[in-house]
Amino acid sequence: MNLLGRVRTLLKNPITIWVYWLVQKVFLEYNFRDKNLKIGYLVNISNCQFGQFNTLYNGASLTNVALGDFTYIGNNSVLMNTTVGKFVCIGPEVLCGLGKHPSRNFVSIHPIFFSKLGQAQITFASAADFEEYDTIEIGNDVWIGARAIIRDGVKIGDGVIIGAGAVVTKDVPAYAVVGGVPARILRYRFESAEIEFLEHIKWWDKDVRWLRENHELFHDIKDLQKIMKVPNKSDSSDENHKKNH
């Protein structure tokens, strides 16, 4: 066995993998100690940004990911090139941003003809001739069920629920509940006026003290609406009219 083969064998050794995870865990949790980052067993992290109180459960893998406050990632989920908002719940074995293959015009879907990443060990391409990855944007207060798959380039609005096993291939509007393969809108969580209210107040940007003191109001949207008045469109129009005269 040559030197390169021995190195590859060493890197695949369970003890080496465990040591690498432990060193990374200690390093990141110390560096982000002011953010209370919690890293589970054998979590893999590369080029990520964290908010407050993020939790990464066992076996999760994150590459080029940014997480908002209080967002957690379930067991064995894989996220790449993804921006995630605040208060997002991602279940186990969710797949986000695993890359694309061409399905039009290109004679072959194989990356050996268009990619320089070497997925098949060698490549015929002298340049990256196809955009293999595109950023996924996930809003705030989103729940993604177990084993859901989200395609590259998709934008998920605030308040969305994605059912377990769904395959999301296109953008999802705020507060929609989607499911199926491919995912389709099943219903909305709230009435249109209530959605407009939530998008206006952006409660996820409130400070933690306010959220803690008012957490019981989150049990019923009508209770929250009673204490947080939002001017309707006619009121805003009247106010603008007065300013202009």
Question: Model segments located where?
Answer:
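Glycine-centered loop/turn positions within well-structured domains
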Residues: A166, K170, A174-A176, R184
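Beta-rich strand-turn-strand
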Residues: I150-G157, A166-T169
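Conserved catalytic-core motifs of eukaryotic protein kinase domains, centered on the activation segment
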Residues: K100-H101, V172, Y188-R189
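Domain-scale signature associated with acetyltransferase and cell-envelope carbohydrate enzymes
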Residues: M1-D141, A148, A183, S192-H245
